[in-house]
């Protein structure tokens, strides 16, 4: 007989997270973000208590899920609007990491829901739409947001599930 190899579902992990305060007169730049890719993304988030760390603890607790690290850009302070050049670099790097990832069975995207750039007022929705173009309609995209994030029509249209914090301080990850 032939033994059939059962493949583990692959879940792509991506994060693009910033809370913008439009009252902050200073633009946020690329260097304000912590950027992590590949194994570094997984190693870091396995040591912290946040959304990605919570997701990884669930994935790691079962033997049949393979997390596929893509890209993480994280700046949680209430920074100013994201400068055009910084937005273009982050979105380019993030989308390139998704394009170069192996085929996946699902996407987990960690976002804040309150990001804005000089050229895109709905960066999260835009990233989800571009991610959808890359992975296709059959791959589910699940998004986590801060409890006061702004949920846009485009975000809803491009994701299969949206989950938000229920508590502040955030202890439900």
Q: Locations of the language-model features?
A:
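Short, Lys/Arg-enriched N-terminal segments with co-localized hydrophobic residues
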Residues: 1-7
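Short, compositionally biased low-complexity segments
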Residues: 24-27, 66-69, 157-159
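N-terminal amphipathic/basic leader segments beginning at the initiator methionine
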Residues: 8-62
């Amino acid at each position: 007989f032939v033994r059939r190899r059962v493949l583990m579902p692959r879940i792509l992990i991506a994060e693009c997270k910033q809370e913008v305060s439009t009252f902050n007169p200073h633009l946020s730049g690329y260097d304000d973000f912590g950027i992590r890719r590949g194994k570094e993304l997984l190693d870091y988030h396995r040591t912290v208590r946040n959304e990605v760390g919570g997701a990884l603890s669930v994935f790691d607790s079962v033997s049949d899920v393979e997390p596929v690290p893509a890209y993480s850009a994280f700046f949680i302070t209430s920074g100013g609007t994201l400068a055009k050049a910084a937005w273009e670099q982050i979105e380019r790097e993030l989308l390139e990491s998704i394009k170069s990832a192996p085929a996946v069975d699902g996407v987990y995207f960690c976002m804040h829901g309150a990001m804005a750039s000089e050229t895109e007022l709905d960066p999260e929705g835009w990233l989800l739409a571009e991610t959808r173009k890359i992975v296709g309609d059959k791959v589910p995209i699940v998004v986590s947001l801060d409890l006061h994030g702004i949920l846009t029509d485009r975000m809803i249209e491009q994701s299969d599930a949206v989950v938000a914090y229920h508590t502040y301080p955030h202890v439900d990850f």
